[in-house]
A protein has these predicted regions:
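Walker A (P-loop) phosphate-binding loop of P-loop NTPases
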Residues: 79
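P-loop NTPase switch/communication element
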Residues: 39-50, 87-138, 184-187
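Walker A (P-loop) ATP-phosphate-binding motif of ABC ATPase nucleotide-binding domains
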Residues: 71
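Conserved, well-folded catalytic cores of nucleic-acid-processing
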Residues: 1, 25, 38-41, 51, ...
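Conserved P-loop NTPase nucleotide-binding/switch module
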Residues: 103, 108-116, 140-200
Length: 201
């Protein structure tokens, strides 16, 4: 629905393109439409090295992190390539492992034969029926994932992800908005506190 009563909308087109629109007068000088077209394929780690995005040494370290089933977060600013790097790293996961990806809006497309994807859902026009990432993380844990992936950690789901990583779910990963690696703990703390704010007193 896109009209005066609901002047903005997020949707996904049949080819996977994400569509966002805001009507005037909220948008100036007029109605704005944004399209986010998904990549048709995933870059490999080797291609990221060849393009100069990663050094060979960094690639070896990241490959070892994946092979040893260590938990990790890819952090960076908006448009810095977090999803691109995470998809490339997930493509290194052994083909017999089950990768369960949880996202608010589907973006990750790792080149892996055993990927299960769960995607959040906004509320309908009556305000009902929403399914958030936190709920989907809990559902994913019931699917016996070899790798639990949260495409973008940006809320209270960080609590469930960290709990899973500390109770035997090795190799879990995700992305997180942060200006530097040093900022990551503070971001995680802020997301955890957002859960506290939502609790009834």
């Amino acid at each position: 629905r896109l009209d005066e009563g609901s002047p903005f909308v997020d949707a996904r087109l049949p080819d996977g393109t994400r569509f966002h629109a805001v009507l005037a007068p909220l948008a100036r000088p007029g109605t704005l439409v944004s399209l986010r077209v998904p990549r048709t394929r995933t870059f490999t780690v080797a291609e990221l090295v060849a393009s100069g995005t990663l050094s060979a040494g960094t690639a070896r370290v990241l490959e070892a992190v994946v092979a040893r089933r260590l938990a990790f977060l890819v952090s960076g600013g908006t448009g810095s390539g977090k999803t691109t790097l995470l998809a490339a790293l997930l493509s290194l996961v052994a083909p017999e492992e089950r990768v369960v990806v949880v996202e608010d809006a589907s973006e990750l497309r790792p080149d892996h034969p055993h990927v299960v994807a769960l995607e959040g859902r906004p509320p309908n026009i009556e305000g009902a029926g929403a399914v958030d990432v936190r709920t989907l993380v809990r559902q994913a844990l019931r699917m016996r994932p070899d790798r639990l992936v949260v495409g973008e950690v940006r809320g209270a789901e960080v609590v469930d992800l960290l709990a899973a990583l500390n109770t035997g779910h090795e190799g879990g990963c995700g992305t997180l908005h942060a200006n530097s690696a040093l900022d990551v703990p503070a971001r995680i703390e802020a997301y955890t506190l957002s859960l506290h704010d939502a609790l009834p007193i």
